[in-house]
Amino acid sequence: MLILFSIVLSACCLIALTSQRYALAAVLLMGFIQDPFRKLVAGEPIFFIVTVGVVFGLLMLKTIQSIGFARSIAPFVNWVDYLYKPLTFFVVVLLIQFFHSLFRWGNVVIGLIGLLSYVAPFLAIIVGYYSVNNLSDVRKFMKVYVSFGLLVAGTVALSFSGFELSVFREVGAGLKIYDQGTILRSFSGIMRTGEIAAWHIATTACLLIVLYTTSTRKHSLLLIASLMVLLLLAIAFTGRRKMLMLVSVFGLCYLFGFFYFRKTLSAVSVFSAGLFVFMAWLAVEYFFPGGYSSDVQNYLARGASVYSDASDRFVELGLKPIQWAYSRVGLFGGGLGIGSQGAHLFQVSSIAGGSSEGGLGKVMVELGLPGLFAIVWLMYAISKYILSCIKLASQPFVSSALMAAVLGFAAFLLVNLLTFTVASQIYGDMFILIILGLVSGFVFALPNLVVNEIKQHSLAQHERSDF
C-alpha cells in the first residue's frame, strides 16, 4: 500500500510542478486520499496528514519561481495599502513567539508546527491568487472539490448504513458521543475523523450552492435539493453538529448578501428558493418513505440542538478560553505551537489545556494579547478588503455570475471565521488551511478577474462588430 501511495504522491508532485491546468486538482486529490491510505497502512503513520502539504509546497514554489518573489506579495499590497501594516505586525508577533517557544520549550518542531498553522493560509492565498484568470477557472476548482466532497458524504452514509470497511473506520480509537440518552458513533467515511469529514461535507454543501448560482445552465432543482439532503444528513451522521450551523449561517449570509448588494430579490429568486425547499422535502420523502428510524432520529435530534445551544457554546468556547489562557500563561502567551495539533506529542499541550479549544483562546495562549490584537487587526483589514471586492462585483459592468461567486466565497470565509472562534482544532488541519487560503486567494484576485472579464467582453463585441 505504501508503494501505491508513493506512486500517487509522485504523480501529484509531478503534476503540481509541470501542469498549471491540473495543479490544483492534484492538491485536492492528495488532500482527499491521504486519510484513506493512512487507514490502510499498519500503525496509521501520522506523516500521511502532511503529504498534501508536500504537493502544495511544490506548487507554491513553482508559482513563486514563475512570478518572482517580489510579485508574490502582490495579493496583499497590490490593490490596497491598509493590509500591509497589520500583516507586517502579525509577522513580527509570529517571529517573536516562535523564538519564545524555542527558548522556553527547547524544541524547534513545536514552534514550526504553530508557525505553519498561521502561515499556511497566507501562502495558499498567493497560490489561489495566481491560479485563476477567470470565473471558469474558479468553477473548475469548485467542481473537482464538490465531486470529492460528495464521495466523502456517500462513504459516511454507507458507513452509517452498516458497511464496515477498514477504510471507513476512524483513525485511532474513534469518537463516541453521549447524547440523546444513548451512545452515538461519529461516522467519518474515508476521512480520518468525523470532524474532518463534517467540515469537508459542509464546505461541499456551500460550494454546491455557489456552483448552482454561478451556472449559466440551471440544473434540476430536484437533483441539487437531493444532493443537499444527502450532504446535510451525512453531516448529522458525523455527530459534529457545529457544521450544520456552518451551512445554515452560510445560506443566510449568502441570501442577505444578494438582498443587500443587489438591493432586491427578484420574483424568480424567491420562487426558486421556495421551489428548492419543496424539492428538498420531496427528496426526504423519497429517501425515508416510512419515516425516520430511531437511529436517524437520534442524530437529527442532536444536530437540531446546535441552534438552541449556540449562544452558550459561544460564551463557553469562544470567550471564556481567553480568560483561561491568561490564567495559564499570562498576557504574553506561552509560545507558538503549544495549543496546536501535534503539541501532545511533545508534552506541552497540557500547558494550553482547554484554553486552545476555541480560536480566540488558542491565539491568546500561543501569541498572547499582542497576537490577539494582531489577529483582530488583520481580520478587520482583510474583511474591509473583501467588502470592497463585493462592492466592485456589485457594479453593473460585472457579470451576475462573478458577483454570486464573490458573495458566496465571502459568506463561506465569514462562517468559517465564526466557527474558528468556538472550534479551533479543526483549523489545525493542513488541508483545511490550504482550502481556506485558496478560496481567499480567489476573492483577492477579483480585480484581476473583473479586468479580464471586461477585456473578454470587449473582444467579443469587437469580433461581432467586425463580422
Question: What annotation goes with each model-predicted range?
Answer:
Residues 60, 206-209, 247-252, 381, ...:
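Transmembrane alpha-helices of multi-pass inner-membrane enzymes
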Residues 160-164, 238, 255-307, 323-328:
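A membrane-periplasm/extracellular boundary helix in multi-pass inner-membrane enzymes
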